Amino acid sequence: MGNKPTIAISHLGCEKNRIDSEHMLGLLAQAGYPVDANEELADYVIVNTCSFIQSAREESVRTLVELAEANKKVIISGCMAQHFQDELLSELPEAVAIVGTGDYQKIVQVIQRVENGQRVKEISSEPTYIADETVPRYRTTSEGVAYLRVAEGCDYRCSFCIIPHLRGNQRSRTIESIVREAQQLADQGVQELILISQITTNYGLDLYGEPKLAQLLQALGEVDIPWIRIHYAYPTGLTPKVIEAIRETPNVLPYLDLPLQHSHPDILKRMNRPWQGRVNDSIIERIKDAIPKAVLRTTFIVGFPGETEEHYAHLVEFVKRHEFDHVGVFTFSPEEETPAYHMANQIPQEIMEQRRDTIMQIQQPISLQKNCACIGDIVDVLIEQENPDTGQFIGRSARFAPEVDGLVYVEGEASLGTIIPVKIKDADIYDLYGEVIN
């Protein structure tokens, strides 16, 4: 058959997309395709796109146009492929194939068909696939860290979100399958496992008839991985049983990523999250009572249609009162296929940006205070990078998740991919600074 073409992957978007990219890389490598990180040397470039909000789509389009101008043969995968399949094929003649979010497992066959002269459109109308531990995977994270997808898709219908349209309804993996993959990752030397799905606290509902996150955490407690971190924990799913499992399972970090989106019941109702307005405060207090050292991250949307000054003031007061460790704020992005796109009283972009900036300014001294409280402490740090010019190491403590939170800059001797004790000497709004304890 001759030499197989060389493939590169350009990964855009979230951790779910990253796992899809890693499975495609694993499948291609297993099938004998050379994989190169350098897009210039590749015969084909797979662009795994994001379509969550307008800015993500713009980044995806820029990447596609740059590759097209470089005369690269492009395979478009991911959420934008699922979202705009026909438009992309008509607008981008360099696209030799387009692959949906539920079809990335067919990437080898897609390339074979392209090599035979076809222009391929491989997109399921409703994604139903989820990869398990038997599907090859080539990790692209630092050596000590891995994401582990426990479920795919979402059964909620938040009025601003197109994810169910792009990723399908929730389908969970079995506890046994997840534990087997966790064990594989432990055998590879992974020190930190990050559990992800669209709504991690709903894990198992479709498969077992009730959420099973507590049981999953207890099972993962038997796996030899020092840190297990939970992302995308919805507040209503943080039952006493789940909170107890977090508290009692030694390798589960007391770190919770809570995408609250807003605090005011009126806005939450318009977001089609009416249940949340009644429980935000009580659940946050319950977490802090049960796990006093819990680290809480959250995200908010400002400028949702109909958000008045009163609604916004409620959110500002909420942020001040709860003193979250980490806060992300996004301006509302109107998505055409969602109910929120057609809602009255859309907020001007300038006002949305002012509201976002104000909350971030309010959060900065809170974050600084939280970080300064670590000065003098000896904390475990997972070492991920080394600065070859200074010899300084860079890592994260348990209170920092990858990419979204801060870093720890470390003086002293260390090895990449290991967790070591570090004495914190200084802090700023985002990061910590310390030295290795021998």
From Swiss-Prot:
Q: Which GO BP terms, alphabetically?
A: tRNA modification
Q: Which residues bind [4Fe-4S] cluster 1?
A: 14, 50, 79
Top class in the EC scheme: transferase
Q: Which residues bind [4Fe-4S] cluster 2?
A: 154, 158, 161
User: Could you give the cofactor binding note from the entry?
Assistant: Binds 2 [4Fe-4S] clusters. One cluster is coordinated with 3 cysteines and an exchangeable S-adenosyl-L-methionine.
Q: Does the keyword Endoplasmic reticulum apply?
A: no
Q: Which NCBIfam families match?
A: 30S ribosomal protein S12 methylthiotransferase RimO (TIGR01125), MiaB/RimO family radical SAM methylthiotransferase (TIGR00089)
Tell me what this protein is called: Ribosomal protein uS12 methylthiotransferase RimO
Q: What is the lineage of its organism?
A: Bacteria, Bacillati, Cyanobacteriota, Cyanophyceae, Oscillatoriophycideae
